[in-house]
Amino acid sequence: MSLPEKAFPVSWDQFHRDARALAWRLADNGQEWRAMVCITRGGLVPAAIVSRELNIRMIETVCIASYHDYDTQGQMKVLKSISPEIAKSGGEGVLIVDDLTDTGKTAAEVRAMLPKAHFAAVYAKPKGRPLVDTFVTEVSQDTWIYFPWDLGFTYQEPIAKGTRG
């Protein structure tokens, strides 16, 4: 796989710094979070870092598949919903965390589930930016972010090659 013209490769160190910067911004918000919902799979790594920094212990996941191939976004499919215990308040006191808000489709889907929640992402693109409350870095819509869990020294196919997003 060749890198597109506007590639933004992110190292583990860079991602860790950016996720901690997100935690700092959220801490400055002054909000007490009763729970965190991370959007899997991309939100797992920043959720681990942010939850540690903000001492959030109740962590839930929501799984929405939108990339059925590595680089092709398709129809949204909810693979795992948010627990009724977290969802019952409409998201009040809940922090949603993801790595990136790109087109905003996934964010809109989760926002509909938790309309009162605070949505945070490490990176945001212009189409998804209106749906996120807190983010660290904005990149152009035509930039492809290469996350460290997708890369080795070159692009790495997932071990389970036959699986889709």
Swiss-Prot record:
EC numbers: 2.4.2.-, 2.4.2.22
Compartment(s) of residence: Cell inner membrane
Protein source organism: Sinorhizobium medicae (strain WSM419)
GO function terms (MF aspect): guanine phosphoribosyltransferase activity; hypoxanthine phosphoribosyltransferase activity; magnesium ion binding; xanthine phosphoribosyltransferase activity
Gene3D superfamilies to which the protein is assigned, alphabetical: 3.40.50.2020
Binding residues for Mg(2+): D99
Protein name, per record: Xanthine-guanine phosphoribosyltransferase
Protein family (similarity comment): Belongs to the purine/pyrimidine phosphoribosyltransferase family. XGPT subfamily.
Coiled coil location: none
Self-association and partners: Homotetramer.
UniProt superkingdom: Bacteria
Gene name per UniProt: gpt
UniProt-annotated binding residues for xanthine: D102, I145
Principal cellular location given in the protein's record: membrane
Cofactor(s) this protein cannot do without: Mg(2+)
Reaction(s) catalysed (UniProt annotation): GMP + diphosphate = guanine + 5-phospho-alpha-D-ribose 1-diphosphate; XMP + diphosphate = xanthine + 5-phospho-alpha-D-ribose 1-diphosphate; IMP + diphosphate = hypoxanthine + 5-phospho-alpha-D-ribose 1-diphosphate
Main function: Purine salvage pathway enzyme that catalyzes the transfer of the ribosyl-5-phosphate group from 5-phospho-alpha-D-ribose 1-diphosphate (PRPP) to the N9 position of the 6-oxopurines guanine and xanthine to form the corresponding ribonucleotides GMP (guanosine 5'-monophosphate) and XMP (xanthosine 5'-monophosphate), with the release of PPi. To a lesser extent, also acts on hypoxanthine.
